[in-house]
Amino acid sequence: MGVAKFKGRSGAPRRMDMFDSIRTRETRENAIDLVNAVLGICLALAPWALGFTGEVAATWNALIVGAAIALVALGALFAFREWEEWVNLALGVWAIFAPWLIGFATVAGATYAHLIIGLIVGVLAALDLWIVHNRPVSTT
């Protein structure tokens, strides 16, 4: 697998830097990943913000899943790969069902945080996948 090279202003080839990925993706796709990164951080901080740190399973799930969502979304900003959106879709679905699967559905703050953030992350990841698969083919 070779390194992508582009011609710089002088006409000489230059190596692709990590920000070329951000510049070449659509603004709305970058916005989706940025929103998902912020939502992941919000989920990771939710136990302290919403006061459910006493519920160990909910706290650890929010921290791990939130951090994973944020890291995957930030990774997609710098080097987009389709699998990153599939991972965030799966993490969003997991966050939706985690309160019942892990057993903290009776903790209102934890349940609502997981449901709302999981739903938004899942929908945005699915939207990003839809955009990738329905992008018009360039003829230029």
Residue ranges, per PLM feature:
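Intrinsic N-terminal pre-sequences and regulatory tails
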Residues: 1-34, 131-140
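Structural signature of hydrophobic alpha-helical transmembrane segments
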Residues: 54-67, 112-117
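Tandem-repeat/low-complexity and Cys-motif detector
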Residues: 32-34, 60, 86, 112
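Cytoplasmic membrane-interface segments at the C-terminal ends of transmembrane helices
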Residues: 77-85, 129-140
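A short alpha-helix capping/helix-coil boundary motif
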Residues: 12, 18-19, 63-64, 70-71
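Extracellular/lumenal glycan-associated surfaces
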Residues: 28, 32-53, 66-76, 88-105, ...
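Juxtamembrane loop-transmembrane helix junctions in multi-pass integral membrane proteins
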Residues: 10, 17-30, 53-56, 76-82, ...
